Amino acid sequence: MIKITFPDGSVREYNEGVNGLQIAESISSRLAQDVLACGVNGEIYDLGRPINEDASVVLYKWEDEQGKHAFWHTSAHLLAEALQELYPGIQFGIGPAIENGFYYDVDPGEAVIKEADLPAIEAKMAELVAKKEAVVRRDIAKGDALKMFGDRGETYKCELISELEDGHITTYTQGDFTDLCRGPHLMTTAPIKAIKLTSVAGAYWRGHEDRKMLTRIYGITFPKKKMLDEYLALMEEAKKRDHRKIGKEMQLFMFSDTVGKGLPMWLPKGTALRLRLQDFLRRIQTRYDYQEVITPPIGNKLLYVTSGHYAKYGKDAFQPIHTPEEGEEYFLKPMNCPHHCEIYKNFPRSYKDLPLRIAEFGTVCRYEQSGELHGLTRVRSFTQDDAHIFCRPDQVKGEFLRVMDIISIVFRSMDFDNFEAQISLRDKVNREKYIGSDENWEKAEQAIIEACEEKGLKAKIEYGEAAFYGPKLDFMVKDAIGRRWQLGTIQVDYNLPERFELEYMGSDNQKHRPVMIHRAPFGSMERFVAVLIEHTAGKFPLWLTPEQVVILPISEKFNEYAEKVKTYLKMKEIRAIVDDRNEKIGRKIRDNEMKRIPYMLIVGEKEAENGEVSVRRQGEGDKGTMKFEEFGEILNEEVQNMINKW
């Protein structure tokens, strides 16, 4: 018999070789119907894969990321199976599950697969699903794998196999299709009830631009047709909210191939928005006793070797900068934390000095393949609202509570009222991969759990999801159309203090290692602005929007009066502009609605004579006429009421 430990700490005994489905069946028939995959000691298993030793087990359903992953991974194989029937001789690259669905990279030879072909491929996939084919996992020797795929002319698969170690190779078969794959997968294709292939694109083999361009087919599947219908409706709304489209319409940021791919440039209005966000966070951080620093955009290679970032980002980094005289290597900064560790080391530290809170809006650079770049959410240069807290082990909980306060203020002030968290803890069984003492880990993990409970924060606990250097708390927000975005992280780190030999003198006159806490409420300025645009559809909170008021004279002779109104509003610290183009008033209104400016003030002969403005509110239409001084007072009060909330 073997012992199976569940997430709630309960333990049951089963026969050796029991699988995830059998465990689910022993709990309830409903769970057995819903379960899609299982976690075994932190590794994701197919439901039919045997468990031969004591283990921690988590059962994953559609609602879980791991459940969706198995569902979409099998769907990728289903796509490949359909392509194999429709395009004889087609070769396959890779076909992973991704955040929303899956894709498969294929080489169709002389054939060309276009978007117009997708409905026929979908129909073939549905035909195969109707057969309810079993998905069978097999271990295979490296030589046998090379022969099997070589006999089929699968050059891409043979290249992958040649790089694998013997004894660690598995295949999955459904119907007449067999693929090289680690899994996990569903036990059959039967649960796949709704299929949509979404697009066709080009992708270089293995992401290298000097390799062959393959055809990448994207898709998504669901266990119910209703879910697909809801998803497609969501995608239509998401297109309207695309931050790249709105950012262009509002003139917030731009990209230039001449400057370089993935390198955003902030235009005046976008810069004003970003600086206002930074000033907002600065004020909060000052209240919470942070000290701001500035560090250089590059660092010596030795710094990143010490921190471990060279090993992690070295192959993905930009080319090193060589100093001609000293012969040293420098790299563009991939993270701010190594520099902050050096700042900590600059002075002897006592337990009385802690916690030390260092903050920086630091720009970092990481090389992303061109095919992975996406607007502001995936770029090669971005600015993190980074801070690192150096504290004693007994201060961890208090610091978590303070950071949670900051993140809550940030989210609520941006109208992200719906958010939750995930606590990532150690694997309960395999603890040898984690750095730091058991005592410190247990204290930190308990501190995070208690902090969430004290704040009444809904938090899901995930065992085995912690980084090797410490537990963390990730915040997920739901935007206006129900999408979940990961924004804001608090991460305990026992690794960097060890690597940099950070110390403080304790009350016992002995040297101790501090605990390091990483935190970034925004995550990065670029990603946060992108999410904020899509959440608000560009209609930012009034206090934040780059331009709060646009004044629209109905003809050129009222431009002078419009300028007078603007001057007064600016004296009231209201961001106002005049649209004095020689256009009809209807055209001006439409154009400025596109720019999402909250208030439009229309001025003509009557308004100029009476010192008034006709007020229009974005999305609400005509709000009547009033003295421009009265409007200024009302708007100023509206903004101050928003700011005073935080």
Swiss-Prot record:
Subcellular location: Cytoplasm
Cofactor: Zn(2+)
E.C. designation(s): 6.1.1.3
Positions of the TGS domain: 1-61
GO molecular function, one term: ATP binding
Residues given in the record as Zn(2+) binding sites: 337, 388, 518
Claim: Iron-sulfur is one of the keywords in the record: no
Annotated stretches, region: Catalytic: 242-541
GO cellular component, one term: cytoplasm
InterPro entries for the chain: aa-tRNA-synt_IIb, aa-tRNA-synth_II, aa-tRNA-synth_II/BPL/LPL, Anticodon-bd, Anticodon-bd_dom_sf, Beta-grasp_dom_sf, TGS, TGS-like
BP term (GO), one: threonyl-tRNA aminoacylation
Keywords: Aminoacyl-tRNA synthetase, ATP-binding, Cytoplasm, Ligase, Metal-binding, Nucleotide-binding, Protein biosynthesis, RNA-binding, tRNA-binding, Zinc
Cited PROSITE patterns: AA_TRNA_LIGASE_II (PS50862), TGS (PS51880)
EC class (word): ligase
HAMAP family xref list: Thr_tRNA_synth
NCBIfam families linked: thrS
The protein's assembly and partners: Homodimer.
Membership in a protein family: Belongs to the class-II aminoacyl-tRNA synthetase family.
Name of protein: Threonine--tRNA ligase
